[in-house]
């Protein structure tokens, strides 16, 4: 090899490294490659590589090389390349592997020809590529059209020119046979490929259980931290946790794995391409939750605009896992913990905590969220799974509803008393640890200040900046001042027997009494008045009762607030006003003041935190009652529990003293030992936490130092010993792992100044191990630390019973005789329709269903649903069913649903003769041809949708029925309120929901945090932070139609607490505190949903006088609109739509209209298929659509709804239980087991059907589809036969956005507006997209010969379009900027009398100037003068 060739080879090797081509690929396929030439066109930004490689590359390696070349240099230039092979060995196998790539290069041929070629597998006989065709004409056409483009495509891969030939099959019949055979082979191959894939996946899974996953070579390199990757790298190794992973099949057939990895210093996106078929299951085995080591290069990805790692090797490794290594009998129990249900504060789920505690070997764990118990159901589920005790609790906001106004009560007249109004300024809040620096007072008699006292005291220590800013007192002002003892002595003499008065007296008296006691004077015995509490009683409507707020109310001057003398003087003047107001309420004596304490003042008290743990099942119910009271009766900013209510419902509850916001900790900081002792007596156990949790108190200068904190904690421990109460060490955990800290920080930051935690450094509050907690309390000594961390926490846990937070069975309301009533109702209606005796098929179905329904206690659910539907029907509104209720024939016979699930059949309404088609030959009874009864000649009624009962209540008939009903949107509130009549107001609640932080919202929080802290996160790191913040509780709400019914022999608190949705005390309904899914199997949930269809039907009935139940379901003219618009008297070009289904529910969207264009349905059953196909996932696209397009089967044969599978397989001869199991697996996207496939094949189930089952991810119930289609067909009937009525109902009920100015101008203007919006594409606003649908209907309407008038001041309605001949008069609220309330007010004012002027219109209808201008601009105020004034000449 000469020097030039060696250089070319070295350059090629370097290029492969730059492209991050795996080493094994280079060694096996690209070893002797060279760069022969590189052509660069700078002005066009184009590079062209000419490469030489000795042997032909496998197609997959060619693709890899092409992908990497284009991707790597895409940010610099547009890259192309040509390969020259030394000795191209072009076997038939090579041609066939490259054939999809060759066809993909044929861009200038027709689509049908291209699709025909894609299905070919050409033969190669050494010189010719042979393609099979149907006849000689096709052969000539193929050679003429394809020879030249094919040669160009072939040569672009570096292959020599090849001759193209077409081989004609012997006959058309033989060709068709060949095509059919090829189809069958293709379907078999699909099934085999899927099974082979599953087999490989199972092998990989099995291998991974035995050993860790390795893709590529083992990695021995040391990983670098992700935060150090700031630029492109040729080769680097990283290690971390995968938090997102997905595999995607590329068009080329190769698989791309992308995953996001973090080491908690940063995150990065990793890509890896499969090299061969064996790689694919390995790539698919890479999952979220794995720890991996990755080796590869880092490059700038222009698509994601970020640094991305291209992996060559991936090795699974052991993750870093925290363990609790304390001996089993010496492990702690966490008694204070917050889950993601602590609103915008807790991060980790209850399940994650319980799982971790179980892994660590803890015997129990408590759940104590802020004010709520919404994590209980999840915690309970996890406890059952892991066999660990969960202690159910809450961190409550405790308020004193009995805070005294007066202390040391005395029977002395207020108006005649002498008062000393005083104020102290101090070095801090603690009467124990801080000192008085100023004491000032005024003596008040008969409203006059008769004496003053003002002294500074030298604390002999520097003041903090906070105190200097707050009080204006400086160190210099205090130097040389008297000792505090001297000041207190003088003050003691000054007060004499006067009544002492202070604002927030407990604070000032605390310092005074502490000082007096130290000097041996004893506590002051004087009567005391607290003006703060007196203000709360006298003036409850004030927003707060701070001194400055109260002074402002009475115009009392307050200068230098927070200086003792000025505060005392202002309080003195204030006191006298308050005393006079009190006497007006007949409060004349000091000892009468406390008669009024606590009256409605729960919301004025500052809450203190405490922990409530349910000790017994009775205690849990009491806890639920307290949580309900806190949310319903005592909610003010937060849910609050008055101390008196806690005392009443304390049975079975352990009360703990809580965190630093609890009374005991605050008392130990601020009050005398005697006061703290009194406070602590209220609690069952005392709580202390790691010093880190309290360090913000040092930050805020409320505590001097860490040593002072240690002293407070030690004093609390001693206090517990004195009182004989257990002291426990708790972690106050808000998340699972230390690294989760950032998520909480972002969530707290998102709340801005509204959250006081933003004013402090957040402590590290992860779920701590035993050793971490012991270390945190080491300053107490090893023995004491172990006692509070291990011994006492276990002691508390042992006192608590195993509790069930939700019952373990269904409790339905009891209605006397419900079982018999449902049985009789079902049989009576069945006999009325089918005669007596009933046909065997009818009776068998009824008995089968009634046995399950009555046997499992579900009859009452049917009866309630019947009553609700009957009430709506009696009130004139149809009810549509949804979900699977239409699978129940009993539901049909009790008139809960109109869908009849029996096999398609004829039944005579006169003599009841019937004929059933139970062989699968008919899809829907509505599709049967019209026939007369052979017995009596009466026209048959046609019915039956062939739906198995099992899809509703399960194969054993024991699944709790979920009866969803679509009521008219305008009737829905009446239906809801009817449940109160049926069951009583205290037994019905709206189903509660919990709104969590959504991904989009979390993204905003992360971006905001990044901006506020001047940070730059990689895209993958943003995704990690978003994931960490997603799912945290943000608010609560209510299900749009769900009503929970509590039986009258139970109490809601046997199941859960209650609250108002979003804590809105003005809401009409209370909701369940738990998310309704949590109690779905325990209480009856009625789904009383609001829907437009019944409202439209009611309006059409009112306008036409036609009973919707009499509308035929097989009207041939109506069926035509599903395949074209001709029946409407318009063309596709006129209405810009290829079907007539614009505005028809379920069939008007672009997606479904496209399906209709491709399938041309003409029967009811095919419409049901379309409905099922459009709602499923992977049922239509890449599945049924291909089968129909390829001619494999027709629309009626494909799998559309879940029930089709069971029915079809039973008709094929499979056991019903297996058919049901297969249906359940397929509908949930779980595919098929190999043994089921064998069984299906035994019963001649075709391969295409099996292949279809394997692709499906989710399926729609047929009963739901049938109910929807029934409503759609009725509405379509009016569109065809009563068009102007249809358009009036559509625009009134369904449309929200209008452009009336355009609509009144006719079709040209409407078409231009449609084209304008369509021209914007993705840039069109949501409002414009909504308007587009309305404009499409408006265009169709005017093209059919109808028109719109302008809004008319005297003829328009408020909210309904009016029909006048062939034109519609729009309502006021259809005008832009005119809301419904304004529209109603205009009509109301108009009905009173005519408008004299625009001024009169605005004044009497109370509309805004903007609304008036909109009416005027539209032209409906023509001729109306501006004002009421008349000019006289």
UniProtKB/Swiss-Prot annotation:
Pfam families: DNA_pol3_a_NI, DNA_pol3_a_NII, DNA_pol3_alpha, DNA_pol3_finger, HHH_6, PHP, RNase_T, tRNA_anti-codon. It is found in: Cytoplasm. Keywords: Cytoplasm, DNA replication, DNA-directed DNA polymerase, Exonuclease, Hydrolase, Nuclease, Nucleotidyltransferase, Transferase. One of its GO terms (cellular component) is cytoplasm. It comes from the Bacteria. Its EC number is 2.7.7.7. One of its GO terms (molecular function) is DNA binding. Gene3D superfamilies: 1.10.150.870, 3.30.1900.20, Metal-dependent hydrolases, Nucleic acid-binding proteins, PolC, middle finger domain, Ribonuclease H-like superfamily/Ribonuclease H. It catalyses: DNA(n) + a 2'-deoxyribonucleoside 5'-triphosphate = DNA(n+1) + diphosphate. Belongs to the DNA polymerase type-C family. PolC subfamily. PANTHER family: DNA POLYMERASE III POLC-TYPE, DNA POLYMERASE III SUBUNIT ALPHA. This is DNA polymerase III PolC-type. It comes from Halalkalibacterium halodurans (strain ATCC BAA-125 / DSM 18197 / FERM 7344 / JCM 9153 / C-125) (Bacillus halodurans).
């Amino acid at each position: 090899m000469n020097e030039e060739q060696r250089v070319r080879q070295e350059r090629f090797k370097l290029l492969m490294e730059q492209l991050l081509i795996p080493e094994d690929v280079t060694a096996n396929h690209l070893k002797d490659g060279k760069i022969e030439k590189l052509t660069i066109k700078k002005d066009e930004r184009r590079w062209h590589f000419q490469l030489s490689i000795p042997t032909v590359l496998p197609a997959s390696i060619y693709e890899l090389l092409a992908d990497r070349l284009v991707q790597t240099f895409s940010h610099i230039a547009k890259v192309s390349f040509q390969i020259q092979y030394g000795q191209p060995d072009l076997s038939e196998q090579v041609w066939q592997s490259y054939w999809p790539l060759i066809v993909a290069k044929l861009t200038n041929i027709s689509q049908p020809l291209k699709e025909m070629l894609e299905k070919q597998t050409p033969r190669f006989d050494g010189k010719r590529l042979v393609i099979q065709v149907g006849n000689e004409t096709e052969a000539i056409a193929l050679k003429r059209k394809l020879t030249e483009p094919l040669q160009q495509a072939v040569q672009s891969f570096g292959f020599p020119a090849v001759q193209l030939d077409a081989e004609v099959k012997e006959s058309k019949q033989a060709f068709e046979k060949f095509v059919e055979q090829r189809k069958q082979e293709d379907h078999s191959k699909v099934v085999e490929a899927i099974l082979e894939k599953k087999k490989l996946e199972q092998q990989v899974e099995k291998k991974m259980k035995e050993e860790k996953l390795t893709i590529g070579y083992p990695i021995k390199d040391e990983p670098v931290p992700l935060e150090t990757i700031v630029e492109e790298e040729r080769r680097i190794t990283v290690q971390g946790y995968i938090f997102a992973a997905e595999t995607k099949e590329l068009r080329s057939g190769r698989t791309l794995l992308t995953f996001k990895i973090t080491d908690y210093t940063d995150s990065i996106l990793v890509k890896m391409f499969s090299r061969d078929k064996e790689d694919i299951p390995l790539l698919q085995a890479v999952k979220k939750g794995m720890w991996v080591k990755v080796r590869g290069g880092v490059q700038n990805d222009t698509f994601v605009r970020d640094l991305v790692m291209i992996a060559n090797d991936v090795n699974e490794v052991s993750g870093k896992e925290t363990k609790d290594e304390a001996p089993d009998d010496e492990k702690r129990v966490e008694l204070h913990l917050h889950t993601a249900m602590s609103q915008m504060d807790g991060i980790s789920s209850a399940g994650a905590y319980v799982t971790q505690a179980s892994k660590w070997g803890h015997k129990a764990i408590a759940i104590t969220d802020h004010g709520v118990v919404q994590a209980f159901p999840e915690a309970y589920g996890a406890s059952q799974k892991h066999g660990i005790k969960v202690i159910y609790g809450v961190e409550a906001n405790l308020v004193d509803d009995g805070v005294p106004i007066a202390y040391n009560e005395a029977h002395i007249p207020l108006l005649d008393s002498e008062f000393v109004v005083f104020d102290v300024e101090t070095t801090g809040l603690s009467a124990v640890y801080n000192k008085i620096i100023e004491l000032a007072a005024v003596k008040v008699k008969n409203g006059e200040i008769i004496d003053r006292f003002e002294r500074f005291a030298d604390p002999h220590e520097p003041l903090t900046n906070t105190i200097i800013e707050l009080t204006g007192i400086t160190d210099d002002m205090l130097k040389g001042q008297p000792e505090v003892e001297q000041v207190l002595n003088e003050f003691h003499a000054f007060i004499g027997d006067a009544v002492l008065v202070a604002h927030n007296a407990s604070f000032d008296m605390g310092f005074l009494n502490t000082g007096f006691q130290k000097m041996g004077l004893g506590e002051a015995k004087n009567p005391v008045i607290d003006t703060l509490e007196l203000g709360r009683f006298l003036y409850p409507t004030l927003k707060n009762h701070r001194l400055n707020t109260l002074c402002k109310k009475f115009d009392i001057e307050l200068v230098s607030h927070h200086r003792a003398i000025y505060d005392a003087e202002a309080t003195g003047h204030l006191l006298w006003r308050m005393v006079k107001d009190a006497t007006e309420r007949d409060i004349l004596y000091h000892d009468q003041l406390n008669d009024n304490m606590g009256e409605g003042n729960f919301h004025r008290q500052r809450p203190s935190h405490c922990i409530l743990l349910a000790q017994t099942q009775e205690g849990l119910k009491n806890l639920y009652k307290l949580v309900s009271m806190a949310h319903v009766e005592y909610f003010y900013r937060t849910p609050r529990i008055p101390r008196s209510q806690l005392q009443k419902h304390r049975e079975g509850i352990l009360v703990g003293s809580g965190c630093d916001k609890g009374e005991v900790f605050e008392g130990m900081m601020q009050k005398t030992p005697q006061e703290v002792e009194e406070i602590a007596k209220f609690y069952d156990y005392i709580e202390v936490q790691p010093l880190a949790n309290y360090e913000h108190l040092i930050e805020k200068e409320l505590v001097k130092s860490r040593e002072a904190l240690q002293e407070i904690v030690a004093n609390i421990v001693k206090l517990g010993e004195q009182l004989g109460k257990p002291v426990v060490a708790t972690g106050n955990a808000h998340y699972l792992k230390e690294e989760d800290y950032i998520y909480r920080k972002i969530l707290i930051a998102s709340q801005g100044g509204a959250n006081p935690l933003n004013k402090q450094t957040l402590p590290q509050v992860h779920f701590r191990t035993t050793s971490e907690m012991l270390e945190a309390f080491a300053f107490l000594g090893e023995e004491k630390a172990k006692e509070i961390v291990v011994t006492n926490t276990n002691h508390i846990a042992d006192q608590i019973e195993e509790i069930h937070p939700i019952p373990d069975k269904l409790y339905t309301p009891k209605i006397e005789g419900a079982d018999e009533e449902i049985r009789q109702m079902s049989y009576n209606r069945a006999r009325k329709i089918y005669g007596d005796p009933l046909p065997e098929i009818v009776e068998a179905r009824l008995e089968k269903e009634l046995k399950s329904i009555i046997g499992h206690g579900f009859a009452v659910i049917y009866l309630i649903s019947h009553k609700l539907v009957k009430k709506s029907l009696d009130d004139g509104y149809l009810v549509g069913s949804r979900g699977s209720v239409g699978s129940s024939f009993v539901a049909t016979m009790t008139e809960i649903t109109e869908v009849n699930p029996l096999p398609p059949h004829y039944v005579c309404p006169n003599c009841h003769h019937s004929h059933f088609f139970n062989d699968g030959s008919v899809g829907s009874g509505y599709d049967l041809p019209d026939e007369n009864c052979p017995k009596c000649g009466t026209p048959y009624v046609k019915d039956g949708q062939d739906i198995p009962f099992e899809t509703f209540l399960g194969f054993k008939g024991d699944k709790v029925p979920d009866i969803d009903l679509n009521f008219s949107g305008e009737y829905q509130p009446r239906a809801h309120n009817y449940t109160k009549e049926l069951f009583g107001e205290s037994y019905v609640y709206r189903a509660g929901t919990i709104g969590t932080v959504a991904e989009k919202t979390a993204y905003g929080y992360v971006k905001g945090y990044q901006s506020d802290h001047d940070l730059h996160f990689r895209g993958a790191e943003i995704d990690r932070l978003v994931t960490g913040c997603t799912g945290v509780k943000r608010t609560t709400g209510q299900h749009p139609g769900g009503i929970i019914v509590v039986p009258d022999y139970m109490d809601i608190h046997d199941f859960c607490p209650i609250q108002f949705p979003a804590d809105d005390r003005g809401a009409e309904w209370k909701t369940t505190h738990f998310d309704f899914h949590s109690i779905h199997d325990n209480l009856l949930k009625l789904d009383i949903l609001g829907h437009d269809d019944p409202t439209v039907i009611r309006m059409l009935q009112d306008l036409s006088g036609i009973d919707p139940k009499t509308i035929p379901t097989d009207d041939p003219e109506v069926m035509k609109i599903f395949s074209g618009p001709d029946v409407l008297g318009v063309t596709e070009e006129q209405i810009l739509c290829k079907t007539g289904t614009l505005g028809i529910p379920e069939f008007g969207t672009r997606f479904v209209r496209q399906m209709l264009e491709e399938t041309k349905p003409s029967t009811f059953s095919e419409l049901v298929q379309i409905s099922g196909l459009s709602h499923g996932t992977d049922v239509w696209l890449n599945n049924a659509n291909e089968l129909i397009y390829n001619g494999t089967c027709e629309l009626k044969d494909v799998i559309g709804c879940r029930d089709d599978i069971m029915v079809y397989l039973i008709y094929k001869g499979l056991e019903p239980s297996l058919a049901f199991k297969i249906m359940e697996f397929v509908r949930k996207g779980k595919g098929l087991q190999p043994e089921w496939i064998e069984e299906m094949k035994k019963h001649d189930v075709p391969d295409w059907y099996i292949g279809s089952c394997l692709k499906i991810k989710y399926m729609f119930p047929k009963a739901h589809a049938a109910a929807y289609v029934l409503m759609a067909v009725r509405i379509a009937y009016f569109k065809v036969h009563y068009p102007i009525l249809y358009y009036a109902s559509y625009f009134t009920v369904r449309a929200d956005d209008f452009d009336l100015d355009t609509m009144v101008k006719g079709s040209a203007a409407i078409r231009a507006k449609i084209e304008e919006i369509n021209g914007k594409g993705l840039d069109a606003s949501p409002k414009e997209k909504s308007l587009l649908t309305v404009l499409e209907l408006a265009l169709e309407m005017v093209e059919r010969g109808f028109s719109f008038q302008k809004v008319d001041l005297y003829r328009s309605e408020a909210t309904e379009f009016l029909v006048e001949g062939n034109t519609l008069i729009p309502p006021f609220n259809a005008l832009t900027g005119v809301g419904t309330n304004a529209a109603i007010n205009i009509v109301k004012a108009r009905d009173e009398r005519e408008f004299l002027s625009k001024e009169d219109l605005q004044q009497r209808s109370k509309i805004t100037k903007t609304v008036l201008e909109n009416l005027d601009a539209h032209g409906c105020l023509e001729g109306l003068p501006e004002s009421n004034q008349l000019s006289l000449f």
